[in-house]
């Protein structure tokens, strides 16, 4: 069997890592990969048509998140760059105007695209504080209220929905607390986009990060929403593209595709929630009922529609992923950006999980492309693989004997 054949027969349950590019998105991108190749900075016909395409895409992003103007949208190379721009650009600007504002508050379960820029800012003299979370991955607003009383906080950055366990955070309430203390608020909404209705005005956020490939768009493009009249510094310097905040010739095909993906996501968010959450709930019900010593992690209700995160006791998660892949299931133990580093999940550690609980964890994330039949097949395979792995474990017979 070729890799292509295996690809066609596999069941893809890893949409938290990336999503298939929608056919409508591909169709909209193609002309900008072929005959519409002008540089948007050029003033001739070829440049003008690519500029118009970027403007349309910017409008579509604006509409998806309920922004006030397309001027509030800055295109980037993805969610990671958007987070870096938000954190570093804001921190450096605020400190240049108000040197005493040198603290950044975030949570202990943020993506590395937030945690690593925070570490970099620490090297530049900033102080970062990581809020604790509950054993369900929830940031209590009271935790923020308790530590933000001093007027030295430049920025609070809390993700809208967690990429591993899917927990949705009370962003609106957290924003109010931050603003009362004179701090700006950024949210990494990479996992929330397309799964939740987004409205930056209702949430009150000052900045919001987005990524194309999480909403059935192409990889290598994202955006940062920056509230009107909010000033931040660029972290990439050059020709002054993207409102002088992100220099470099724009990735026109990617931006066009991202814009179309935003338009589709905005139209289909209700359909997405109904279809995907229905499949997810069915999957969770079957797993917990049919697979012994299994547990769902994260909040039951306040979680994004596509996410199901489990711990299977006395099973090694990496062995489980490999066996599932061999049996036609694509899944993950957690963040795709951390898996290749072979490090334990900092998210699960922050939630108080033991070593056994962390190593026995599995994330299944669904999409619009999945069907009930695929879920049934996946659960059947998962159950069989877990049984096989447990039988091979030297500790299983001892456990069974102890349980009588």
Residue ranges: model-predicted function:
Residues 1-404:
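Pyridoxal 5′-phosphate
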């Amino acid at each position: 069997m070729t890799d292509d054949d295996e690809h066609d027969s596999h069941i893809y349950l890893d949409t938290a890592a990336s999503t298939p590019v929608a056919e409508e998105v591909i169709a909209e991108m193609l002309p900008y990969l072929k005959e519409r190749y002008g540089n948007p900075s050029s003033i001739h016909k070829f440049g003008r048509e690519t500029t118009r395409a970027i403007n349309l895409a910017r409008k579509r992003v604006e509409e998806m998140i309920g922004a006030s103007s397309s001027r509030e949208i800055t295109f980037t190379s993805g969610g990671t760059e958007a987070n870096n721009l938000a954190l570093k650009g804001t921190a450096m600007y605020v400190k240049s105007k108000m040197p005493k504002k040198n603290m950044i508050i975030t949570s202990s379960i943020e993506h590395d695209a937030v945690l690593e820029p925070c570490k970099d800012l620490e090297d530049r003299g900033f102080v970062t504080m990581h809020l604790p979370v509950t054993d369900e991955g929830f940031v209590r607003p009271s935790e923020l209220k308790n530590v933000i009383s001093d007027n030295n906080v430049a920025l609070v950055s809390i993700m809208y929905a967690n990429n591993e366990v899917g927990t949705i955070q009370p962003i609106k309430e957290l924003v109010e607390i931050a603003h009362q203390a004179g701090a700006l608020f950024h949210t990494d909404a990479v996992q929330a986009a397309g799964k939740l209705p987004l409205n930056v005005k209702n949430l009150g956020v000052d900045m919001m990060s987005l990524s194309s490939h999480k909403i059935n768009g192409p990889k290598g493009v994202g955006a940062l929403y920056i509230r009107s009249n909010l000033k931040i510094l660029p972290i990439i310097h050059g020709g002054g593209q993207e409102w002088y905040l992100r220099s470099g010739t724009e990735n026109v095909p990617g931006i066009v595709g991202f814009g179309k993906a935003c338009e589709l996501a905005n139209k289909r968010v209700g359909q997405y929630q109904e279809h995907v959450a229905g499949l997810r709930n069915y999957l969770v019900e079957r797993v917990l009922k049919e697979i012994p010593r299994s547990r769902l992690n994260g909040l039951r209700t306040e979680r994004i529609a596509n996410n199901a995160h489990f711990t299977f006791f006395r099973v090694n998660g990496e062995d489980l992923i490999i066996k599932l892949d061999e049996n036609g299931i694509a899944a993950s133990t957690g963040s795709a950006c951390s898996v290749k580093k072979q490090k334990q999940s900092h998210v699960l550690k922050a939630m108080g999980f033991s070593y056994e609980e962390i190593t026995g964890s599995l994330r299944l994330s669904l999409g619009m492309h999945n069907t009930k039949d695929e879920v049934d097949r996946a659960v059947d395979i998962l159950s069989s693989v877990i049984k096989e792995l447990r039988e091979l474990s030297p500790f299983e017979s001892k456990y069974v004997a102890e349980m009588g």
